[in-house]
Design a protein with these regions (language model features):
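Glycosyltransferase catalytic domains, chiefly GT-A lineage
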Residues: 2-343
Length: 343
């Protein structure tokens, strides 16, 4: 896959750089090891980053069936060694019933009125994030997505009716969100993001709006959503509403480095090896080579097998990056058939 180039307008001049914080979520299980990869890649790819890297950690409580905190003390120590701050937060709305909600409630772990960029933990930083010219007054989010929601039923409401019902519910202007270059009832006409990254000038304001919309949709969905599943899509349904309500929208070309040469939302290592360019693989294997990293993350079996036992390279040899299947599900099926899907 050829990655989008950020172009000459991507890098901000030093005097124009804005200091900002980064938020990821860290918790017991897979995400604690992914957090190590994120932190290590940030330090290698952008050693000049001078903001705070905050790992939001959900705390045990009535919303969690089991303790969600980072369970490996070596992971906790390594994250701190990599300059991350582990900050607790309480789960009041979601928890184990909808762990994707951590990215919403975790915003409360950030200091108020300080610009932030949220990343899903399964992301690698592959370039100088500190030089991306964010306009923190105009929030945006990742466009690296497929038409995963809504799923249109044969005799049910269409895209327009479904999305308009959501904007109407919260008193938002629907028409202004449409991409009129796309045909009516084609999914890309409607404002829809991958929630793998997003940003704004204040995490509290963003988090409160995001939480209000997400819980409102969950607890009392508009009528046209009656046949729609909101698990796991709730965050991606509420996100465009929150961004639009705060004066944001689709990201401009100045942000092309995100999901381009500056960051990679890899999601599953099998997919990374299958479709990402050589630079991403090189960054992954470089940041996982030091013994202090290796001895910790190899405890997670998929990382051990994919990175250190060569299974990832076997996946990579299966595909031509210049001629990948058009849909991700086709990639997944081929990888699973080869018994190389690990997460």
């Amino acid at each position: 896959m050829k990655r989008r180039q950020a172009g000459s307008g991507m890098a901000a001049k030093g005097k124009d750089r804005q200091k900002f914080n980064i938020l990821i979520v860290g918790q017991n299980g897979r995400l604690q090891y992914e957090a190590v990869l994120f932190a290590a890649s940030l330090r290698q790819s952008d050693p000049g980053f001078d903001g705070r890297l905050i790992v939001a950690e959900p705390q045990p409580g009535e919303k969690w069936a089991r303790d969600p905190r980072i369970g490996n003390p070596e992971v906790r120590a390594l994250l701190k060694q990599l300059g991350a701050e582990i900050v607790p937060f309480e789960s009041r709305a979601f928890g184990s019933a909808y762990p994707h909600g951590n990215k919403i409630e975790g915003l409360s772990a950030l200091p108020e009125a300080e610009p932030f960029v949220f990343f899903d933990t399964d992301t690698l930083i592959t370039g100088k994030l500190s030089e991306v010219p964010f306009d923190f007054d105009r929030p945006a989010a990742s466009m690296r997505r497929e038409g995963s929601w809504p799923e249109i039923e044969l005799y049910g409401p269409g895209y327009g009716e479904i999305w308009k019902s959501l904007y109407d519910r919260f008193g938002l202007a629907y028409q202004a969100t449409l991409d009129l270059s796309q045909p009516d009832e084609y999914w890309q006409r409607y404002l829809y993001f991958n929630a793998g990254w997003f940003f704004y000038r204040c995490p509290r304001a963003f988090g409160e709006r995001f939480l209000s919309y997400a819980t409102g949709i969950r607890d009392d969905p508009p009528g046209p959503l009656v046949c729609q599943s909101l698990d796991p899509w709730l965050d991606q349904v509420a996100l465009p509403l929150a961004i639009h309500s705060l004066g944001g929208g689709r990201p401009g070309p100045e942000l092309a480095g995100l999901d381009g040469e500056v960051s990679c939302h890899w999601r599953v290592l099998s997919l990374l090896y299958a479709r990402e360019d050589d630079h991403v693989v090189d960054v992954l294997e470089a940041v996982t080579a030091p013994n202090k990293i290796k001895k910790v993350i190899k405890e997670y079996e998929p990382f051990k097998r994919m990175i250190y036992q060569g299974k990832g390279r076997k996946v990579r040899a299966m595909f031509d990056r210049a001629d990948l299947p058009p849909r991700e599900q086709m990639l997944r099926n081929q990888i699973k058939k080869a018994n190389l899907w690990m997460r």
